[in-house]
Swiss-Prot record:
Residues 1-204 form the ThyX domain. Binds 4 FAD per tetramer. Each FAD binding site is formed by three monomers. It comes from Wolinella succinogenes (strain ATCC 29543 / DSM 1740 / CCUG 13145 / JCM 31913 / LMG 7466 / NCTC 11488 / FDC 602W). GO terms for biological process: dTMP biosynthetic process; dTTP biosynthetic process; methylation. This is Flavin-dependent thymidylate synthase. PROSITE patterns: THYX (PS51331). CDD domains: ThyX (cd20175). Keywords: FAD, Flavoprotein, Methyltransferase, NADP, Nucleotide biosynthesis, Transferase. Pathway: Pyrimidine metabolism; dTTP biosynthesis. Coiled coil: none annotated. GO terms for molecular function: flavin adenine dinucleotide binding; NADPH binding; thymidylate synthase (FAD) activity; thymidylate synthase activity.
Length: 204
């Protein structure tokens, strides 16, 4: 799993939006300590969380499973553009047969779990899918055979308010292990000067 922060909004934009309400622009210190404290006080402590929506982050997420993608898609206040399996299954079609000991080669396509039985089942499903592709069945139809562990990637854009909600819920120990890992990796990818606005679930 790899997460790359592609773009983010400056804290000065959020501070400016908050100061618009009181027309207190002269008190700004250009995104310094005063503005940082203002954002935290108004957006977090005073619960005017809509002001945090002016902060927007775009991430490029690679190497998560389709199972994790389904969990991610439940967070609807975000925009996601996902790698199309319909157009990329030709990569798999060109592979040699996957046998039981071929996990290292299969990891290009599959997310590895802690369960050997699950990994073996995923490997068999991957080979079954490859065989279906070799029959000349269209990618549009063959993708119905994709295992949930099949890797994908996406560009994901989310505002700070929605990201706070995501990180709190998905860093919990009750969340899927893979999305817990994603939550932690997203938090680490945030700009250092923004991280004070976000907390991971301590139970995670």
């Amino acid at each position: 799993m790899t997460v790359t922060l592609m773009q983010h909004t400056s804290l000065t934009i959020c501070a400016h939006a908050i100061r618009t309400c009181w027309q207190s622009f002269e008190k700004s210190d250009g995104g310094g300590e005063k503005d940082r404290e203002l954002i935290d006080r108004v957006g977090n402590k005073n619960k005017h969380a809509s002001t945090l929506e002016h902060l927007v982050y775009t991430f490029y997420i690679q190497g998560i499973s389709r199972a994790c993608l389904q969990e991610l898609a439940r967070h609807r206040i975000a925009s996601l553009s996902v790698k199309s399996s319909r157009y990329t299954l030709k990569e798999l079609k060109a592979e040699e047969e996957f046998k039981e000991g071929d996990w290292e080669r299969a990891k290009r396509y599959l997310v590895e779990t802690e369960s050997e039985a699950v990994n073996l089942a995923s490997l068999k499903a991957l080979e079954n899918l490859r065989q279906v592709l070799l029959l000349g069945i269209s990618n549009d139809m063959a993708k119905y055979c994709l295992p949930e562990s099949y890797k994908t990637e996406l560009t994901w854009t989310i505002n700070a308010r929605a990201l706070q909600n995501f990180l709190t819920l998905r860093s919990s120990k009750s969340a899927l292990w893979e999305i817990r890992k994603l939550a932690k990796t997203l938090h680490e990818a945030l700009p250092k000067e923004h991280r004070y606005l976000f907390c991971l679930n301590q139970e995670g």
